[in-house]
Structure formats: C-alpha cells, structure tokens
C-alpha cells in the first residue's frame, strides 16, 4: 500500500487562514496531499525508493495514517490484504507475470485493471 497506494491524493479546503510548512494558506483555498510524496519521505523511510516487503517499521499513510480522519475499516482491510497475499503465496508459489499490467490511472486513483499471470500449479496446495 505504501509503494502504490490506490488513492493517490486527497484535497481539503482551509476553513481558516493557516500556515503549513511555511506556506500561508487563506481560508477557502484548497490544499492537496499526495500520498506518494508522504509515503516516500526520506525523513521517515530509510531508502524509500527501494521495494522491501519486509520493511519494519513501515509507517505509511495508507488508510489515513492516524487522527480524526483515520479509516474505520483500516484493520479489516489490512487483515484482508494479508490473507489474500498469504493464500496466493501458498497456492501459487511460482506465480509469474506473462505481460505488463494494464493500469488504471487518474488524478486521484491508481489501480491494476488487468494483469495476465501464469503458474504451474505444482504446489501441494495448488487449487
């Protein structure tokens, strides 16, 4: 989720004049946060551009981070993602891509629409 977050950005409208990281923001102005920027912050992540599935700690801001806008379904989503990847690894340990993924890209969303893969099914637990 840190590497390729499905929601790429969100915006908020300032309700009062404020300052953020030295930038003055007037009431009514919009502010956009790009998750990719936050999730690759060199002050938070050692070598943020390296893909490391075992990264620990991994304090990404997927599901809203913490605070009043924290996603109420975050724990269920994390558990579901873990179960899905564990099942894939168990049943298709030799899963290999056949081609490049077909991606859905927009100003706000990032997803894989279609990705053809192959596996031998030689695992003892293969479906």
Describe the predicted segments one by one.
Residues 76-104:
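Cytochrome P450 heme-binding "Cys pocket" and the immediately downstream C-terminal segment
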Residues 67, 75, 105-124:
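Conserved N-terminal glycine/acidic-rich loop preference
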Residues 38-79:
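Cytochrome P450 heme-binding Cys-pocket and its upstream "meander" loop
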Residues 5-8, 37-43, 47, 91-96, ...:
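Cytochrome P450
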Residues 1-21:
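Conserved cytochrome P450 K-helix E-x-x-R motif and the immediately C-terminal K′/meander segment
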């Amino acid at each position: 989720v840190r590497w390729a977050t499905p929601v790429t950005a969100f915006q908020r409208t300032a309700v009062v004049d404020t300052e953020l990281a030295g930038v003055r923001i007037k009431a009514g102005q919009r502010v956009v946060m790009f998750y990719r920027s936050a999730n690759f912050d060199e002050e938070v992540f050692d070598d943020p551009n390296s893909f490391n599935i075992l990264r620990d700690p991994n304090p990404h801001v997927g599901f809203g981070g913490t605070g009043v806008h924290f996603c109420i379904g975050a724990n269920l989503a994390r558990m579901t993602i873990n179960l899905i990847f564990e099942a894939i690894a168990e049943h298709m340990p030799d899963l290999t891509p056949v081609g490049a993924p077909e991606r859905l890209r927009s100003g706000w969303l990032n997803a894989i629409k279609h990705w053809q893969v192959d596996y031998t099914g030689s695992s003892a637990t293969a479906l």
